[in-house]
Structure formats: structure tokens, C-alpha cells
């Protein structure tokens, strides 16, 4: 009986550890260091799009230099390293960036990232 009790206590501790790792401001490798700011390992964005300033602030000078070396990209549409695509004109993030046969975005709306980026309330 005591061994079973110890087993369940240990199991619940592991469950609590994993649930705390999955909660908070982390969504599939994305971090939200401030309300309305979302970062992956390479870029930081806000509701206006990709931000070199926020990238520098939260990821450092090297990441900002890498971003500024890119030319001809639309900062209002981007795909995070985890594959989540966001469009600031639509104010939506989707699980992927693909289009359906109707020519419209077909990816399922990613509620977590959409809320972190466009619906943050401090």
C-alpha cells in the first residue's frame, strides 16, 4: 500500500512538472516576453509584423543583423520556426501558410498564437 501511494505521488509530481512546462507564455517553441510580442529563436514580432527592434531587444544583436540582411520580405506576413503562419492584415495566425483550391488560406486558425499576438490585454 505504501509503495502504491509513493508511486502515485511521484506520478502526480511528474504530471505537474510537464503541465507547468506547457503552460504560461510558451506555445510550441514560441515565447511571449511581453504583452503582444511573440518570438521564436530567430525573430520577434508584434501586431504590426516582424520587428527588428524587438528582435534586437529580446534575441540580441546577431539575430537583428540576420533579420536586417534579408531583403524584399513582407514584414506583415511571416512563418515562425514552428510552422505557424501569421498575417497581420488578417489579424490571424494559422497552423500553416498554405492555400486551398479556392485561393484562400486553408490552415486551421491557431488560437494560442493569435491570442498571444493580437488579443493581449495587460
UniProtKB/Swiss-Prot annotation:
Kindly name one Pfam family recorded for this protein: YcgJ
Q: Does the keyword Signal apply?
A: yes
Task: Name the domain of life.
Answer: Bacteria
Which range is the signal sequence, renumbered to this chain? 1-22
Q: Which UniProt keywords apply?
A: Signal
InterPro entries per the record? Uncharacterised_YcgJ
Official protein name in the record? Uncharacterized protein YcgJ
In the UniProt record, the gene name given for this protein reads ycgJ
